[in-house]
């Protein structure tokens, strides 16, 4: 692939990444103003879904920030951000159900989760070390160091690639549960789906940027 095309694709991916980041915040804020007919808070919905799956030991807690919601397998906790925890909106319920989906994945030993956890230590090390190895390889003209740097960056890309099915599956579980348990219907369900789709696209954008950066590193290494 010609290098100028690679750079054009990388610029396009960066723009797409910025768009998805803005879009997910806008979509969440829009549907966080749309109350559900059930009138239950996102935290209560999360608790209900956890209990219906026998996950009584998983706690639901509040964390600061916006869109900082996550599941922490170390503490077995579904952490919901301040705008989500007490909200009765369809957007908040979608986010909460998604995080519960991650808790269910861990409980069921979902295969992509196990693969991602196995890669995590290398990806964490690589996120801070790859650039050091790559630069040292250039400075000292040592291809092996550049190769190590590229390999570590490839581990980051692989981690992001494995993250995609994890996130999409969590959203699928969330939407299926929301429908099957009669939590949201009609326009409310559609709004929750749009919220989760917008969030999922941020992972697609991040992977696209990382993959193109990896190709650029490989191309520059071969050129040198």
Protein language model features and the residues they cover:
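Residues within membrane-spanning alpha-helices of integral membrane proteins
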Residues: 10, 124-127, 131, 150-153
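Serine/threonine-rich low-complexity intrinsically disordered regions
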Residues: 1-2, 41, 126, 142
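Hydrophobic alpha-helical transmembrane segments of small proteolipidic membrane proteins, enriched
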Residues: 1-27, 137, 143-144, 148, ...
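Post-HExxH zinc-binding segment in Zn-dependent metallohydrolases
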Residues: 120-142
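Polar-ligand-bearing catalytic/cofactor-coordination segments
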Residues: 21-123, 127, 158-224
């Amino acid at each position: 692939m010609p290098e100028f095309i690679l750079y054009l694709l990388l610029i396009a991916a960066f723009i797409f990444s910025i768009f998805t980041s803005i879009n997910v915040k806008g979509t969440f804020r829009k549907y966080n103003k749309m109350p559900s007919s059930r009138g239950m808070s996102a935290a209560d919905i999360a608790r209900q879904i956890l209990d219906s799956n026998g996950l009584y030991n998983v706690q639901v807690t509040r964390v600061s920030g916006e869109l900082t919601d996550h599941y922490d397998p170390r503490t077995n906790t579904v952490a919901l951000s301040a705008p989500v925890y007490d909200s009765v909106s369809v957007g908040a319920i979608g986010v909460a159900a998604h995080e519960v989906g991650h808790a269910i994945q861990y409980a069921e030993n979902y295969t992509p989760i196990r693969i991602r956890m196995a890669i995590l230590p290398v990806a964490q090390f690589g996120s801070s070390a790859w650039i050091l190895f790559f630069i040292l390889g250039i400075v000292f003209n040592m291809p092996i160091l550049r190769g190590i740097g590229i390999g570590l960056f490839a581990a980051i890309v692989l981690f992001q690639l494995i993250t995609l099915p994890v996130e999409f599956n969590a959203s699928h579980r969330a939407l299926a549960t929301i429908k099957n348990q009669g939590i949201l219907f009609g326009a409310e369900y559609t709004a929750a789906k749009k919220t989760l789709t917008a969030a999922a696209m941020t992972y697609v954008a991040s992977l696209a940027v990382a993959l193109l950066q990896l190709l650029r590193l490989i191309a520059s290494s071969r050129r040198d």
